[in-house]
């Protein structure tokens, strides 16, 4: 078990749901990102998704695209983010961390080098939205070489119907359910058949099912809390941090409130 699996097993034992946030690394700088990570841990975050900025983030909506571009302009790079991760681990951060990034970044860094750096710096999971299931063979082979490798998180969407059993057969960690079509950050206008879709995913999944895309508050997911095992907030958290000048207090308050309401 790695940190993700340990945390999710503990939550299951406690009968609680997971809360996951997304933060763009290096926005406005690495020191601020580190402070926000520790602030979230203090508030009881379950898993942190850290976005690696990319110049063409096709799966992301305008908020995360803008954050990505700003971070790149401020000098954020994969190498710098690995260094930042190493520092937060050495400083005592224990929360599970998942990198969300595009395969182009992994490919240009070198798949084996990338995985080794993840192991070295305490990265627990990977979300690669532009890497189709059929093309995951190379990175899966490299990940399988070391038991300390990060987990490749499987994404499923409303158009995955019919493919869900195949997608989830060997999935680990958690399933990331895209709750609506299109890009991130559109608000809680969930797919009209979301309940049927999530029920099918839950039926096929041996691991926790998380819902993301367009979530702002725990109330957004309340109608589906009997199906899902947790919620992921991205664009709204980015906007909240920016509106509050990347205040640690704002991050702590938001995470603590969302977690409390999610498990009320």
UniProtKB/Swiss-Prot annotation:
Pathway: Amino-acid biosynthesis; L-tryptophan biosynthesis; L-tryptophan from chorismate: step 5/5. Keywords: Amino-acid biosynthesis, Aromatic amino acid biosynthesis, Lyase, Tryptophan biosynthesis. GO terms for cellular component: cytosol. It holds the Pfam family Trp_syntA. It is an enzyme of class 4 (lyase). The active site is at residues 49, 60. GO terms for molecular function: tryptophan synthase activity. InterPro entries: Aldolase_TIM, RibuloseP-bd_barrel, Trp_synthase_alpha_AS, Trp_synthase_suA. It catalyses: (1S,2R)-1-C-(indol-3-yl)glycerol 3-phosphate + L-serine = D-glyceraldehyde 3-phosphate + L-tryptophan + H2O. Its EC number is 4.2.1.20. NCBIfam families: trpA. Tetramer of two alpha and two beta chains. The alpha subunit is responsible for the aldol cleavage of indoleglycerol phosphate to indole and glyceraldehyde 3-phosphate. Belongs to the TrpA family. This is Tryptophan synthase alpha chain. It comes from Lachnospira eligens (strain ATCC 27750 / DSM 3376 / VPI C15-48 / C15-B4) (Eubacterium eligens).
């Amino acid at each position: 078990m790695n940190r993700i699996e340990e945390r999710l097993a503990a939550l299951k034992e406690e009968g609680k749901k997971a809360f996951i946030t997304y933060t763009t690394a290096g926005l406005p700088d690495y020191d601020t990102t580190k402070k926000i990570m520790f602030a979230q841990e203090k508030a009881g975050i379950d898993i942190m998704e850290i976005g690696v900025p990319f110049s063409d983030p096709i799966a992301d909506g305008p908020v995360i695209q803008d954050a990505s571009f700003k971070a790149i302009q401020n000098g954020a790079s994969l190498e710098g983010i690995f260094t930042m991760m190493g520092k937060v681990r050495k400083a005592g951060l224990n929360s599970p961390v998942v990198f969300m990034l595009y395969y182009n970044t992994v490919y240009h860094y070198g798949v084996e080098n990338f995985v080794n750096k993840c192991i070295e710096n305490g990265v627990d999971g990977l979300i690669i939205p532009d890497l189709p299931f059929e093309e995951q063979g190379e990175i899966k082979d490299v990940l399988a070489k070391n038991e300390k490798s990060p987990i490749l998180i499987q994404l499923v969407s409303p158009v995955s119907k019919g493919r869900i059993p195949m997608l989830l057969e060997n999935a680990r960690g958690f399933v990331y359910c895209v709750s609506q079509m299109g890009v991130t950050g559109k608000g809680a206008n969930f797919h009209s058949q979301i309940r049927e879709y999530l029920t099918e995913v839950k039926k096929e999944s041996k691991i926790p099912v998380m819902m993301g895309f367009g979530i702002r508050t725990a109330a957004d997911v309340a109608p589906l809390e009997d199906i899902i095992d947790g919620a992921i907030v991205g664009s709204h958290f980015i906007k909240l941090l920016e509106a509050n000048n990347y205040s640690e207090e704002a991050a702590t308050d938001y995470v603590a409130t969302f977690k409390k309401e999610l498990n009320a």
